[in-house]
From Swiss-Prot:
Other comment: The basic functional RuBisCO is composed of a large chain homodimer in a 'head-to-tail' conformation. In form I RuBisCO this homodimer is arranged in a barrel-like tetramer with the small subunits forming a tetrameric 'cap' on each end of the 'barrel'.
A single BP term in Gene Ontology: photorespiration
Subcellular location: Plastid, Chloroplast
This protein's name: Ribulose bisphosphate carboxylase large chain
Record note on cofactor: Binds 1 Mg(2+) ion per subunit.
Active-site residues, Swiss-Prot/TrEMBL: 165, 284
Keywords noted in UniProt: Calvin cycle, Carbon dioxide fixation, Chloroplast, Disulfide bond, Lyase, Magnesium, Metal-binding, Methylation, Monooxygenase, Oxidoreductase, Photorespiration, Photosynthesis, Plastid
Site (Transition state stabilizer): 324
Self-association and partners: Heterohexadecamer of 8 large chains and 8 small chains; disulfide-linked. The disulfide link is formed within the large subunit homodimers.
Principal cellular location given in the protein's record: plastid
Catalytic activity entry: 2 (2R)-3-phosphoglycerate + 2 H(+) = D-ribulose 1,5-bisphosphate + CO2 + H2O; D-ribulose 1,5-bisphosphate + O2 = 2-phosphoglycolate + (2R)-3-phosphoglycerate + 2 H(+)
Amino acid sequence: VGFKAGVKDYKLTYYTPDYVTKDTDILAAFRVTPQPGVPPEEAGAAVAAESSTGTWTTVWTDGLTSLDRYKGRCYNIEPVAGEENQYICYVAYPLDLFEEGSVTNMFTSIVGNVFGFKALRALRLEDLRIPPAYSKTFQGPPHGIQVERDKLNKYGRPLLGCTIKPKLGLSAKNYGRAVYECLRGGLDFTKDDENVNSQPFMRWRDRFLFCAEAIFKSQAETGEIKGHYLNATAGTCEEMIKRAVFARELGAPIVMHDYLTGGFTANTSLAHYCRDNGLLLHIHRAMHAVIDRQKNHGMHFRVLAKALRLSGGDHIHAGTVVGKLEGERDITLGFVDLLRDDFVEKDRSRGIYFTQDWVSLPGVLPVASGGIHVWHMPALTEIFGDDSVLQFGGGTLGHPWGNAPGAVANRVALEACVQARNEGRDLAREGNDIIRDASKWSPELAAACEVWKEIKFEFEAMDTL
């Protein structure tokens, strides 16, 4: 019959070092730590097999299809410098293995069962190359950076936000008051915390109403367009869309979603709704560290960031480099560029394993949030540039005089940094002087500078190259 039963080495079929990758292939870079005694070729081939067409034994039905056409192939293996028995295995997947426009299906294949595979001690997906042939099947972000700036009429500077704290426990009316004070003081956005959905102390509909009132009142007073990220995340997709519909009916400019806990299917549905109805979409990455914080196992955040750009979102949290949460500078800037730019060159020093061409898929604004305050403003302005959202939760609400003065302090600091940069000053070197000079003209900023003059969160990053 030509069918030979039994178990054979994966590497006989799935390790193909001579393979020349196609422009339509999805390419993956895995950090593979094999069990002792398992050769790297076998481990790399096993990853390619188990995440595509393979199973543990030869099966009769293999003969009914063309495996050569559909199989994943491990086409290159390189040892990781400084690590014993660890390799970067490159795998190419034919495009036909994936459903069009479905991040869910892409991840089910590439990071599915294979991560529980016994022959591997650990496995981490470091990067994915999404070919234009596949990215073109996605809508992507509902609006993108340029359209958002046009909607908000704000140019030439980062946008300012603030997460309303305490994150849980406020009534809807008091929550709306906090939103109003921040927006009136000079912020562009305020934000629902990611855990605020619809709890007994504050149901979603009440919150939406009071926040809408805060938005329109502060807009009328300041003459600027304002927004509040209304968290539409819910227990079912239907409920989530219902909340987004209500936000649109109130005239709110932006809604929010927790894309990892909510799931990619829900996120893509919401992104489609947002584009059809002119809502911006803010994405929070709650749960990302469960997946991306271990260096040897899981998935790097740059992969989750690429997946979000496909699934759809106009903002996404991307670490701060300087605040209280994980993030190394070069690596963070690597995935920040992957979110914003049309074309990103391969650059291993920034953790970018593949050249990525997004072919005019709209960009996503990175959001810096978590333990940042006015003294960080020069560094943030320099590191993230204009196309970003800088979010100060405690750094606004913790101001000794209250929310509105806290917002004023942040806005004055930001405008001072942008002006200094435009005049050609070096923010990295002169940052503290720039803030000090500005605080002479702004008592609010001076008070903020005094409160946070010594606060730092300095720990070694877990996830290095």
